[in-house]
């Protein structure tokens, strides 16, 4: 079976425009650079066909008002392609309708420069890219991940042997998200908690910026990857919400969440980046991934799996997985919400875990075993026992139980519960524009000297 994208070396005419030389074989056609870029952009526009995103006149203006779309930008290939397509769409609307646009675009990046050891900062690279879409103005905001940490709501969380979660509030202390994640038992747990942070912060920024829609750059391959990863992590109940267009409510505001690149494979995304000459804007981690499976996260493993499928000509497997995942729905009965990730809990995970696991030790049968047991009991600190007795139970889902299950020692795991700290912006190009205007009105020493 052929790969999803094949770069052509022989001279052949594009099957679309019939004038330029074809450079890639995509799906069933051989296309030139311009036709391929137009083909990918058409896939996104198909997803954004709603009237609210078009240039509005008459009653439509009153019905939809000014639409604002938040684009979640990681700096990777998919989100970069999404930004380029939206930028070109706005530029086209601006030219065809004499300065009018169907919506305003707010780009938000969660700063992972230090966390993932990135090769560059968003605020240094992307202003140059945004300048390509003039006269369209696109807002670029870089948010600190520490915005998630509310020091007033920090709790120490422990899992009991019978899988119940206990928490106790701790004194407010200055701590960063990176420091909290260091307490995770493994990389997969840290990755899982980071996803919770990302989703929460993006929705909070969308509400604050008065955005009615949030768009993610997840392509079809990434969505299929997400389905497998969520299943492995015990978060199958949120698969539908994580991959399908849906509506979220935050601060009494309804926000539509969309995945416009859902019909495009990762190989096709990479081809777009190459042909549109966007490579210099791609932000990536400088940390080399381990070649040993046990040192990889769950998402790393599933990503490698789909890369192998693509390389061997089975890229369409991602389409099958993604379409199957779209058909999944959440159970109708809801007991409560998880106090860590906010997901609906449909059945008590501790009851189910107790039925399928054995946590009690074997019976003591010899005097030697009894002696060792008494020594163990004597080594337990009374302070620790009193501390555990003073903890309060909290509701957590099965996925969070798995994530926190490997926390070692009596220190527990520190996490903010039901808190909402102030959003901390590290960069806003709106502020940069305002500063430029102010600088134009600042008099220098020479300008201040007036001859009489």
From Swiss-Prot:
Q: Which UniProt keywords apply?
A: Cytoplasm, tRNA processing
Principal subcellular localization = cytoplasm
**GO cellular component term of the entry, any:** cytosol
Q: Where in the cell is it found?
A: Cytoplasm
- A Gene Ontology biological process annotation? protein urmylation
List GO molecular-function terms, semicolon-separated: nucleotidyltransferase activity; sulfurtransferase activity; tRNA binding
Coiled-coil ranges per UniProt: none
**Pfam short name (any one):** CTU2
* Keyword set includes tRNA processing: yes
Its annotated pathway? tRNA modification; 5-methoxycarbonylmethyl-2-thiouridine-tRNA biosynthesis
Q: HAMAP family, from UniProt?
A: CTU2 (MF_03054)
* Reported function: Plays a central role in 2-thiolation of mcm(5)S(2)U at tRNA wobble positions of tRNA(Lys), tRNA(Glu) and tRNA(Gln). May act by forming a heterodimer with NCS6 that ligates sulfur from thiocarboxylated URM1 onto the uridine of tRNAs at wobble position. Prior mcm(5) tRNA modification by the elongator complex is required for 2-thiolation. May also be involved in protein urmylation.
- Which PANTHER family does this UniProt record tie to the protein? CYTOPLASMIC TRNA 2-THIOLATION PROTEIN 2
**Recorded family membership:** Belongs to the CTU2/NCS2 family.
Task: Please give the name of this protein.
Answer: Cytoplasmic tRNA 2-thiolation protein 2
Q: Which gene encodes it?
A: NCS2
């Amino acid at each position: 079976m052929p790969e999803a994208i094949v770069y052509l070396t022989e001279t052949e005419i594009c099957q679309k425009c019939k004038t330029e030389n074809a450079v890639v074989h995509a799906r069933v056609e051989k296309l030139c650079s311009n036709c391929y870029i137009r083909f990918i952009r058409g896939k996104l526009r198909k997803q954004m066909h709603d009237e609210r995103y078009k240039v509005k006149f008459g009653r439509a203006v009153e019905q939809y008002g000014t639409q604002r779309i938040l684009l979640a930008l990681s700096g990777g290939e998919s989100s970069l392609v999404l930004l380029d397509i939206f930028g070109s769409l706005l530029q086209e609307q601006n030219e065809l309708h004499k300065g009018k646009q169907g919506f305003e675009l707010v780009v938000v990046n969660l700063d992972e420069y230090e966390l993932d050891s990135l090769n560059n900062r968003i605020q240094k690279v992307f202003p140059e890219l945004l300048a390509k879409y003039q006269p369209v103005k696109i807002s670029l905001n870089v948010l600190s991940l520490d915005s998630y940490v509310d020091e007033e709501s920090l709790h120490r969380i422990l899992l009991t042997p019978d899988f119940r979660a206990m928490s106790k509030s701790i004194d407010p202390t200055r701590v960063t998200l990176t420091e909290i994640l260091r307490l995770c038992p493994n990389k997969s747990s840290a990755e899982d908690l980071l996803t919770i942070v990302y989703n929460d912060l993006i929705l909070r920024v969308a509400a604050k910026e008065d955005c009615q829609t949030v768009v993610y750059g997840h392509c079809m391959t990434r969505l299929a990857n997400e389905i497998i990863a969520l299943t492995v992590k015990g978060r199958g109940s949120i698969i539908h919400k994580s991959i399908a267009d849906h509506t979220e409510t935050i601060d009494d505001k309804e926000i539509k969440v969309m995945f416009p690149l859902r019909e495009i494979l990762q190989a096709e995304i990479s081809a777009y980046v190459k042909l549109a000459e966007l490579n210099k804007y791609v932000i990536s981690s400088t940390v080399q991934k381990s070649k040993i499976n046990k040192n990889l996260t769950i998402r790393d493993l599933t990503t490698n799996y789909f890369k192998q499928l693509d390389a061997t000509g089975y890229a369409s497997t991602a389409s099958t997985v993604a379409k199957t995942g779209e058909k999944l729905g959440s159970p109708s009965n809801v007991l409560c919400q998880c106090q860590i990730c906010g997901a609906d809990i449909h059945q008590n995970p501790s009851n189910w875990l107790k039925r399928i696991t054995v946590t009690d030790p074997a019976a003591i049968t010899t005097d030697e075993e009894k002696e060792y047991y008494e020594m163990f009991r004597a080594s337990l600190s009374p302070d620790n026992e009193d501390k555990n007795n003073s903890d309060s139970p909290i509701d957590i889902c099965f996925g969070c139980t798995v994530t926190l299950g490997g926390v070692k020692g009596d220190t527990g795991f520190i996490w903010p519960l039901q808190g909402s700290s102030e959003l901390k912006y590290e960069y806003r190009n709106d502020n940069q524009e305002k500063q430029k205007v102010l600088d134009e009105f600042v008099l220098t020493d020479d300008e201040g000297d007036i001859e009489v």
